[in-house]
């Protein structure tokens, strides 16, 4: 027992010596990283008995962060814009063929006219043996344009006689009778005036359109002497007629006069116009003079036939 107590103090002194050595080492090394200092403090604390056989923690290595790299997108490749004009053609150096050996015959120089030009849009075709070949395009000269212009038509007047129109063959052919249709004029005075005046043209030489336009002008022009206007004299009525019979029939509507009386037995109908009496008489006789051309139906009045024909057209 006494031996154990005497050997104990040297062991505690060794432990405290290690602690002092650790403190001195820590104070002398101020540049040690903070992580290693903390590990050493935890490993060799004065309150913990050091274990020389224990494994020490390896220092933690923190790799440095590389600066970020900016990756730019690839540059876009734009296609050249389309242009209606063709790109300029590079000039090809002229090719001169090798000189032929001298011959005994001399040929005259060939002159090319200035209107033969080279087309710049044709691509030359070359080979090892043949020189570059260019297609030639001839421009249209003034002579060609003059020949392409349409010929001017000469205005020819009709011949004075039919024999001249047929030429020399007219004497060999039989006589041809030229028939011109004669259209009656609406007024006899117009025909008399054309016959009396030598300067005016005859009615046969006028076209139907000219005669129709003249008739319409006579109807529309009330100041003409040939155009007679029959106006109604009843107060407040402004109707006008070209025929006196139409005016008389109109005046009977104002006066109430009905001179046309039906003579059928036991019939006392009276009318202001004669055509109305004729149409009324067909009711007694049963006459139907208006017949349909498409079917076998007959009608007593023309307006009834016109209405019936419209029904055929709609079917």
Swiss-Prot record:
Probable transcription factor which regulates lipid catabolism, storage, and secretion, probably by modulating genes involved in fatty acid desaturation and beta-oxidation, and lipoprotein assembly and secretion. Involved in reproduction, perhaps indirectly. It comes from Caenorhabditis elegans. The lineage of its organism: Eukaryota, Metazoa, Ecdysozoa, Nematoda, Chromadorea. One of its GO terms (molecular function) is DNA-binding transcription factor activity, RNA polymerase II-specific. Its main location: nucleus. SMART domains: ZnF_C2H2. Belongs to the krueppel C2H2-type zinc-finger protein family. Residues 149-169, 182-222 are annotated as: Disordered. Keywords: DNA-binding, Metal-binding, Nucleus, Repeat, Transcription, Transcription regulation, Zinc, Zinc-finger. Residues 213-222 have a biased composition (Basic and acidic residues). GO terms for biological process: fatty acid homeostasis; innate immune response; regulation of gene expression; regulation of lipid metabolic process; regulation of transcription by RNA polymerase II. A zinc finger (C2H2-type) spans 230-254, 260-284, 290-312. This is Kruppel-like factor 3. Induction: Expression is repressed in response to high levels of dietary calcium. It is found in: Nucleus.
């Amino acid at each position: 027992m006494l031996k154990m107590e005497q050997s104990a103090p040297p062991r505690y002194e060794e432990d405290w010596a290690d602690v002092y050595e650790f403190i001195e080492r820590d104070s002398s090394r101020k540049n040690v990283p903070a992580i290693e200092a903390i590990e050493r403090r935890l490993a060799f604390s004065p309150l913990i008995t050091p274990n020389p056989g224990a494994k020490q923690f390896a220092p933690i290595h923190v790799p440095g962060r590389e600066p970020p790299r900016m990756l730019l997108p690839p540059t876009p490749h734009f296609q050249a814009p389309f242009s209606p004009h063709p790109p300029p053609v590079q000039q090809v150096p002229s090719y001169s063929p090798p000189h032929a050996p001298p011959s005994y015959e001399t040929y005259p120089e060939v002159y090319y006219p200035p209107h033969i030009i080279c087309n710049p849009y044709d691509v030359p075709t070359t080979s090892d043996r043949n020189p570059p070949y260019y297609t030639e395009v001839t421009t249209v000269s003034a002579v060609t344009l003059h020949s392409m212009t349409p010929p001017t038509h000469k205005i020819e007047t009709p011949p004075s006689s039919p024999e001249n129109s047929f030429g020399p063959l007219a004497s060999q052919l039989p006589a041809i009778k030229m028939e011109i249709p004669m259209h009656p004029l609406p007024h006899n005075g117009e025909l008399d005036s054309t016959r009396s005046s030598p300067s005016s043209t005859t009615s046969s030489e006028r076209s139907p359109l000219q005669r129709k336009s003249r008739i319409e002008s006579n109807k529309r022009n009330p100041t003409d002497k040939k155009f007679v206007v029959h106006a109604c004299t009843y107060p407040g009525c402004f109707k006008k007629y070209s025929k006196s019979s139409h005016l008389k029939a109109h005046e009977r509507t104002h006066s109430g006069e009905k001179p046309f009386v039906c003579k059928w037995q036991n019939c006392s109908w009276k009318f202001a116009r004669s055509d109305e009496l004729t149409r009324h008489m067909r009711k007694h006789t049963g006459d139907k003079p208006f017949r349909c051309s498409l079917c076998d139906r007959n009608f007593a009045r023309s307006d009834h036939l016109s209405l019936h024909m419209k029904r055929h057209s709609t079917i």
